[in-house]
Amino acid sequence: MTVRVSFLIGCLGALTLPAALADNGRLIATGGASSIEGTAGGGLTPWAVLAGYGEQHEWGATAFATTVNLPDYRLDVAGVALAYDNRVELSFARQRFDLGSLVHKLNLPEDSLGQDVLGLKVRLFGDVVYDTLPQVSLGLEYKHQTDFEIPRLVGAKRDSDVEGYLAASRLFMGAAFGYNVLVNGSLRYSRANETGLLGFGGDRRDSRSLLKEGSLALLLNPRWAVGVEYREKPDNLSFAGESDWADVFVGYFPNKHVSFVLAYAHLGEIATLDHQNGSYLSVQGSF
């Protein structure tokens, strides 16, 4: 799978919703972007916000395409998300991870790994802007690794799993020299190897770990945002170390229907190859 503009346009055209589509509703950029697992949030981490800009009794929806180019690998992701009543979100993402030079280095039987991610997120309480409490959401993700031969060879125990996370998001108005600041923190309960692309559990550890994730975004104006993300990851496989992930990003939100995120992703060691740092680009359409 390669990321093509035509795919994104097709996804957007396929999203048919009732007449109560969100148009005004939440502040621009507070719907976030799309994470690599399909849910609303940052690129690497989910936020407590839901897809699109729908409020009470309104629908919201997004479709996105993301590509991450690294020295030895490439990750392509495409997906959609649908939310209703600013209460519940369903999402789906399909990932393809090209193994690049690792194929010849380790004489691998496949040249890529794939994963499908089906997500459910429910807002428990609060609001990212208008409540005294932060918006808090609970999420579940069912992940299925679709090319399990390589993960099995390196020690992964299973090709699918369910993981949960709890996220809290809050927009602080004028908090940084007059600029708005969005803060998100998440706890994930997971045993995924490289987010599931290398299966789940391993010869070193097969139980789930409680993992920290966070995002900080400075809204320079209603259309531009800059920020950082961090994602802690487990270390379940003995054949290679697994680095925590981080990025520095710039987001552009010209209106509520399209957004662009460009980032420098610091992903460290992936499957024995270190210094996997490179560019991240995501395009999202919203309703």
Residue ranges and their predicted role:
Residues 1-33:
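Cleavable N-terminal export/targeting peptides
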Residues 22-148, 152, 159-164, 169-175, ...:
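Transmembrane beta-barrel domains of Gram-negative outer membranes and organellar outer membranes
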Residues 156-236, 244-245:
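Detector for outer-membrane/organellar transmembrane beta-barrel domains
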